[in-house]
Amino acid sequence: SLQSLFWNQLFLPGKDRLNESSLRQFNVNLQSSGTTTPVSLHQGNMDFVWNADKQNGTIGQTTVSYRSQQHGNSTLTWLYSNFTTVGVKSFPAKQSFTFTTTATRQKQTVQATLDMDEVTTKDNWEVNSTVSSKYKKIETKDILAKIMTL
């Protein structure tokens, strides 16, 4: 999921790749006003919204929200800009993300910006990689539970 956010892609939590049947889980609001079309996904306590440009399909903003009476509310907002061509794809050379949570009993916010001067790749480089087996999967609820103990 984090890799998909960085690469400015739609994703389904827990899935490595999207296929035609998985795309049916997304809702698209083609009647939206403005320059973007919201693509949304609801999964349990989490909501995902990707705002795609109506002209070229690039995602300008992704918002991931987690709501829980027990763990509070958390929101990740990821903004994309300064798109540049990398091979045949458009890549956001500037990315800003803000994470806000009440899981710590008081509202806390962290913000980071990646502003890349140049984006290049080498030939034969695999865009989609897999996480090494030495790492174990940690569920969102477990991360929030750890934050709660801070």
Where are these regions (language model features)?
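Acidic/charged, solvent-exposed loop-and-adjacent secondary-structure segments enriched in E/D, K/R, S/T
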Residues: 1-15
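Gly/Pro-enriched, hydrophobic low-complexity segments
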Residues: 19-20, 24-133
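Gram-negative outer-membrane assembly/targeting C-terminal domains
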Residues: 124-150
